[in-house]
Amino acid sequence: ILKSVAIKEIHHRVKNNLQTIASLLRLQTRRTDSEETRQVLGESMNRILSIASTHELLAQSGVDEVMLGEVILNIKNNTMRYFSNPKCYVTITMEGGDFQVDSDIATSVAIIINELLQNSLKYAFQDRSSGEIRIVVEQGKLYSSIQVSDNGGGFDVANTEGNRLGLSIVQTLVKDKLRGNLEIESGPEGTCARFDF
């Protein structure tokens, strides 16, 4: 019981500290006139909140594991809240299994999903009035996978991978933290990113 209380307390404190940092970034965002600065601070704030929401779930559970579906749902809701575009109606659907993962995997997946959703919402649906994003989770015996796909305009993967911070973060987390593989395919019919862990 003491271990459970300690785990809850640690995750609760981490969540509160991260939310304080996000609040400071929000204040900073309000003080700038630069749209580019506002966008960069907003992206950073969303990254921090994705980690904070995972720690909130971990604090509620009292163990160092959490249901992956809950993590993804939180990230989806946060991302839609901060990156909604009144000129473009985007739906995000989730499919597949739900299973427990430890805190390290949960945090890495939260950041990865956040980055992939941000990229789709920022770039995929430019000059469009609607779009769809699908998140598919597959639990395997040795490896599990997550696929995030959109029906947007696509992009040149070969000439973009090193130029976008979000994709660099995704590549690093999949390789170094999850010890998995990342595949990105993109064309005029949309983009699909798939990673395993």
Predicted segment positions?
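ATP phosphate-binding glycine-rich loop and adjacent ATP-lid/helix-beta elements
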Residues: 157-185
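Short acidic helix/loop segment immediately C-terminal to the autophosphorylated histidine
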Residues: 25-39, 62
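Hydrophobic core positions in the C-terminal catalytic ATP-binding module
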Residues: 133, 191-197
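Short beta-strand/loop element within the Bergerat-fold HATPase_c
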Residues: 130-142
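Conserved short strand/loop->alpha-helix "switch" segment adjacent to the catalytic nucleotide/phosphoryl-transfer site
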Residues: 1-11, 33, 66, 83-115, ...
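Conserved phosphoacceptor histidine of two-component systems
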Residues: 8-19, 23, 27
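Short beta-to-alpha transition helix within the HATPase_c
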Residues: 42-49, 53, 57, 64-82, ...
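Acidic ATP/Mg2+-coordinating residue in the GHKL
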Residues: 150
